[in-house]
Amino acid sequence: MVTINDLHYSDPIDEDNIINMRIPLYDLEVDDQFINHNVPDLKAFQVFPNVWVVPERYTFYSTMKNLDAPANPSRSSYYDPTYLQSDAEKEVFLQQMILLFKRINSTQEGQQFLNLLSRSIPVPYESNGDVAMGTTQVIKQMDDKGNVLKHRRAHIIIYGPGPDLMAKGSKALTKSRETGRGCMAEIYFSPMYHKTYSTKLTNKNSLVDKSVQEFVPDPAVTLIHELCHGLHALYGIDLGNVGSWEFNSNPNSLFSSWFSSKEAVNFEEVMTFGGEDVKVIKSEIDKKIPGILNLIKTTVEPIINKITDPHDEMLQCLQSKYPSLKGTLGQFFFDDTQLEKDIRDLWMVMNETMFAENLKALTRARYLVPKVENIVQVDILSPNVYTIDKGFNHLSKGFKGQSVSQSYFRKISALARGAVVRACPNPHFSSQRGLSSCIEILEDDLFIMSSKDSFTDTDFSEPSVGPVSYKAKKGADTILDSTLSNYDFSKEINFTSTVPIITVEDPLETDEDVPVISEDRTVYVDDYTTFHFLEAQKIGKEVVPTQTKVVFTTNMEEALFDSKKVYTVFENTASRINEAGTGIANGMMFYQWLKGIVQDFTEEATQKDTFDKISDVTMIVPYLGNILNIGNDIRKGDFMGAVELGGVTILLEAIPELTLPVLIGLTIIEDELEKEQVSQTVYNVLDKRDEKWEEVYGFVKQQWWWMVHTQFETRILHAYQALNHQVEAIKANMTYQLANYRGNQEDKELLEKAIDDTLQSLYYAVDQAMHNIKRFLIQSSKSYLLNQMLPKTKEQLLAFDQQTLRNVNDFINKNQGVLGESLAKDLKKKVEKRLTSLPVFNLEDLPISEFEDLIHSHEIDIQDSEVLNIGVNNGKIQDLSGENTPLTLGENLHIVNGRDNQAVRLNNQLDSKLEIQSRPNIHFTAFEDFSISIWIRCSMLRNNRNRGQKYTIIQQFNKYGWQLAIQDSVFVWTLHDTFNNQIQLTSGSALTNKNYLLQNFWLHITVTNKRSEKSRLYINGVLQDQKDISVLGNCHPKEPILFSIQDNSDPNYFVRFEQFNVYRKALTDSEVNRLYWKYFEGSYLRDVWGERLTYNRDYYMQLSTLPGRGIKREYRTWSGFDYIILSELGTQKIPTHEVTYPKLYQGQKITIHSDGKNLEPHVKSNKNIRLKIDDFYIGVVNPFKLPEWRPESGAYVVTTYNHAEDLCLYFRTRSSSQSLYYGQLIMNDGRNKSLLNYTLKGSTYWIWSSAWYYENYNTSSKTAGNWYFIPVDEGWKED
């Protein structure tokens, strides 16, 4: 594990970890137009070996000298010339960087990554037999007079930000960054200033809490992105010049007016970001691999084999850097397969997305996110804000710690709004559409599509194929390793403080990246666009919601030119809002109006329809075309009809001009060859042909991803904008009605809360709607690839195959004399067969996981919606959900043995209580669905005064709220709203002689509440009762959730509970069932109450078919044996009910012992046990030895015999039921398995072991072989 040094800016220079450093480019022989030669030597801090932090602004180049804001700043930029100028600020910067490195170092993957950065020295140079570092691979340590003291290793140097505080970047300090040699890298970075993004395109969309609409990335993850660039520079595998996608559009073209002009995205950026984008460039990586491997081998092997000292520092570093090096001193060589795997790991695994997963942080799903929402400032040094183990998310689940709404994020105003496109009516065209004014569109809201130029230069030509054995690329088969298990960092390397150097010709990088600044522009249109429809859904900027009622209209043109009107496609929602007169008369009416809005909007926004016209698209969102102006030119107002006619192509803003690969059939060398060489050449051609198909497939995927799928993603974001515009307009109306409320003014505070609740419900509906929209659009994108793009490409490939076939046949014919006629025919058959077998278009190479994640993300896992989990952990009662909810514990609250581990015991006393403090996460709105579940065990009622009395166990109540109570052993769930309306659910009939075990038995209670439908009560996963609750109002006071027994007259009554959970959703029937059964995933046997069966504990035993009769030991004089029989029937009356039940504590106690091979305290199914009664082990005898028995194969009578061990029997246990908690005991005599049960002979119930029973009844719930194990428990009393 790397040790992160704790350093402070005020610490004196120690010539070790704190030095005076000269910037690496200072001595570059160029004029001041490029390098700022006025930069003094800087104080540098080595936070871990070879990684340095310099708390200074990055101002060393001509374009970065001036810290003032430029005249035309880019969007989302922020300038502050005073930042990082004082020693105090430099100390803060240093501590922030140390904290981020400690966070990265907190996981195994992070430790490996930092080890790589520390040990991966650039490959040294050789001069006159000496091996040393080049001058461009080290930094100069200076004295206070400006003299060079020594040269030091520096792999990564991290500075503060340049002039733009929002800009983060890295720079490889040599032009030969792709040569396999490697070089140091500089990073400029700010841990304090961050851009924010919408949660709609994230790496963990389904896990994000619905309240999080916008998030701030974890700065540790952002730093890792830049460090990955540095790692590539150290290995000399930087892909910065390999390829890129251009997004510059022609501003004079109307077609390109709706597409953004963005900076080019190069392959290196995609690799260091990771995620799904990497899959799309995999074919490019496959092509690059052979050249990179060759460069590394030809660079490293000659150098490392010049080193003669086995203890040499550079030798140790190179061996650590390249675990694929094999051999001994002076004779090192690379294992090609392992080297390829290691390089693929560095490219494909070490990236921002992987580390975001590793650190459990939210990040973008795509590198090319269309829009930065805001910029924020945050102090991560506060432990209440950011921690080493969890970053921002240390106090909450659902990534709420990264929500921009958190108080510790301070929004700051960017200097630029970004470029604007003004869409104005064409002055030379008399439009009948009524276009009369301009609208403004932000550049960042435009569609994104890579230009055709990004793909036109791709070269698919191949050199002539020869007989040299050819190794096909197998990159797709490589298993990537995020833990870098092939690397061994256990051996310490003591880095020397002085590095020998050689002056070499290795020019430093002098190119600078100049950001693309988009300019404002005007375009002239003849018809309405998507952006006009979006504009029509916005409220006018001049509208004051408290003074003006916003009217909803289904006429887009009317809304576009009237700021007080908003266009909508949701007619029911519009009617409900528009028909409400100004000033609602009373609180109940206002509340019902709000509730109706939620119901109408949710129903209309989440609508979807099945779709069978296109095989790849299974559902459609019918209103999508009308809110985004899609398909109106084909079937106005009929989006489904338009898609049926035009296919998914109509969803594109522009049909891209795709580049078809230019393919020429493979050619073959003309040399004279021997028979084996001719055959090998033919096989090489076939392998090369398959590889060419894969290469072209990859090319098609790239074009689809960057020219087609980006348009579908923009549609997704436009849909999200439209739905949010609808919510904002509804919010304005609610504000207007509240300002003009005519009822009791004291109600206003409650109505404000109700409006907040309504907004949360509306945003939840938007989220549900977006799941449908994403599913539809992503399926459509995939359909376009498979049905529009792929067939055209296959035509090219088939023509390529035909030409290749002719070339191969010509080659075979020319060499028939060498091959012989028979072998020539055989080769031709193999060629024809191979070329008729088409390589499959591999969907796994698509970002297919994105499709599956988005399609199924509405199926949120139960655990992901959990917001509270009260249980016992290490002897402490606490919230186990990760939310750390504050608890108040009464003095008479006890921790006892529970169903699985430990439980909480409530006594019927005032100081026996548990309060769960209310917080937003468990305080639901009047419209939010929620569920609760709990394992609970209530002791037997023994006081007659409790008959008919309802007593409460759990509640969140203060004049209104919810309660879980018991009445005559029946569970009662109550919801009571603020208007004094209530509903009650019950768990069934009262106690009878059949369900007497409902008392003192562990039961799983679940209540689900779907506010627009029903509340449902379940016991052990089975539905007991359900009622409509759509008419109820708010049932959630801000009171704590209280566990306390109230209104019970029995002072000895108590309740045990564990696993009290609250979920922010209404669990479905299947989820309730799954939640119950997941508690039985272990193989433990359970006693009659539901707790784990325990070794060395006393139990009564009864058969489930003969309750009230326990086993006992009885001596029979005529045989001289003690036998195990069933006792007489015992009964008991429950004091509080007219119920007589079979006694449980009947017969004699037995003790369970293990077979001596088991160390666990609890009994598992399929384990061997021994049973002891009266200090005698239970055994068996053959029944034919007894006079009144007939011989029967595989049958034994159970007995005991003094203390003799020869009759001791090992029974194998088996769990028979998970709901009634009984088990079976099986004996194996070596020939037959027999089941322990009973048989009635005369008046005696004999216990015996029968093979016939096992064969016929071993799976029946009614068999006489199912045994209850009954421990004495204080919750169950018998006379």
Curated annotation (Swiss-Prot):
<dbReference type="GO" id="GO:0020002">
    <property type="term" value="C:host cell plasma membrane"/>
</dbReference>
<dbReference type="Pfam" id="PF01742">
    <property type="entry name" value="Peptidase_M27"/>
</dbReference>
<feature type="disulfide bond" description="Interchain (between light and heavy chains)">
    <location>
        <begin position="424"/>
        <end position="438"/>
    </location>
</feature>
<keyword id="KW-1036">Host cytoplasmic vesicle</keyword>
<dbReference type="Pfam" id="PF07952">
    <property type="entry name" value="Toxin_trans"/>
</dbReference>
<dbReference type="GO" id="GO:0006508">
    <property type="term" value="P:proteolysis"/>
</dbReference>
<comment type="subunit">
    <text>Might be a disulfide-linked heterodimer of a light chain (LC) and heavy chain (HC).</text>
</comment>
<keyword id="KW-0964">Secreted</keyword>
<keyword id="KW-1043">Host membrane</keyword>
<keyword id="KW-0862">Zinc</keyword>
<feature type="region of interest" description="Belt; not required for channel formation">
    <location>
        <begin position="476"/>
        <end position="525"/>
    </location>
</feature>
<keyword id="KW-0472">Membrane</keyword>
<dbReference type="InterPro" id="IPR000395">
    <property type="entry name" value="Bot/tetX_LC"/>
</dbReference>
<dbReference type="GO" id="GO:0008320">
    <property type="term" value="F:protein transmembrane transporter activity"/>
</dbReference>
<keyword id="KW-0479">Metal-binding</keyword>
<dbReference type="GO" id="GO:0044162">
    <property type="term" value="C:host cell cytoplasmic vesicle membrane"/>
</dbReference>
<feature type="region of interest" description="Translocation domain (TD)">
    <location>
        <begin position="435"/>
        <end position="843"/>
    </location>
</feature>
<dbReference type="GO" id="GO:0005576">
    <property type="term" value="C:extracellular region"/>
</dbReference>
<dbReference type="InterPro" id="IPR011065">
    <property type="entry name" value="Kunitz_inhibitor_STI-like_sf"/>
</dbReference>
<keyword id="KW-1035">Host cytoplasm</keyword>
<dbReference type="GO" id="GO:0016020">
    <property type="term" value="C:membrane"/>
</dbReference>
<comment type="similarity">
    <text>Belongs to the peptidase M27 family.</text>
</comment>
<dbReference type="GO" id="GO:0004222">
    <property type="term" value="F:metalloendopeptidase activity"/>
</dbReference>
<keyword id="KW-0645">Protease</keyword>
<keyword id="KW-0528">Neurotoxin</keyword>
<dbReference type="GO" id="GO:0090729">
    <property type="term" value="F:toxin activity"/>
</dbReference>
<keyword id="KW-1032">Host cell membrane</keyword>
<keyword id="KW-0482">Metalloprotease</keyword>
<feature type="short sequence motif" description="Host ganglioside-binding motif">
    <location>
        <begin position="1250"/>
        <end position="1253"/>
    </location>
</feature>
<dbReference type="InterPro" id="IPR036248">
    <property type="entry name" value="Clostridium_toxin_transloc"/>
</dbReference>
<comment type="function">
    <text>Strongly resembles a botulinum-type toxin, with the appropriate domains and residues to have proteolytic function, although its C-terminus (which binds to a eukaryotic host cell) is different enough from clostrial botulinum toxins that it might bind another cell target. Might be a precursor of a toxin that binds to an unknown eukaryotic cell receptor(s), and be taken up into the host cell via the endocytic pathway.</text>
</comment>
<feature type="binding site">
    <location>
        <position position="225"/>
    </location>
    <ligand>
        <name>Zn(2+)</name>
    </ligand>
</feature>
<dbReference type="InterPro" id="IPR013320">
    <property type="entry name" value="ConA-like_dom_sf"/>
</dbReference>
<feature type="region of interest" description="N-terminus of receptor binding domain (N-RBD)">
    <location>
        <begin position="860"/>
        <end position="1080"/>
    </location>
</feature>
<keyword id="KW-0800">Toxin</keyword>
<feature type="binding site">
    <location>
        <position position="229"/>
    </location>
    <ligand>
        <name>Zn(2+)</name>
    </ligand>
</feature>
<feature type="binding site">
    <location>
        <position position="269"/>
    </location>
    <ligand>
        <name>Zn(2+)</name>
    </ligand>
</feature>
<feature type="active site">
    <location>
        <position position="226"/>
    </location>
</feature>
<keyword id="KW-0378">Hydrolase</keyword>
<dbReference type="InterPro" id="IPR012928">
    <property type="entry name" value="Toxin_rcpt-bd_N"/>
</dbReference>
<dbReference type="GO" id="GO:0008270">
    <property type="term" value="F:zinc ion binding"/>
</dbReference>
<keyword id="KW-1015">Disulfide bond</keyword>
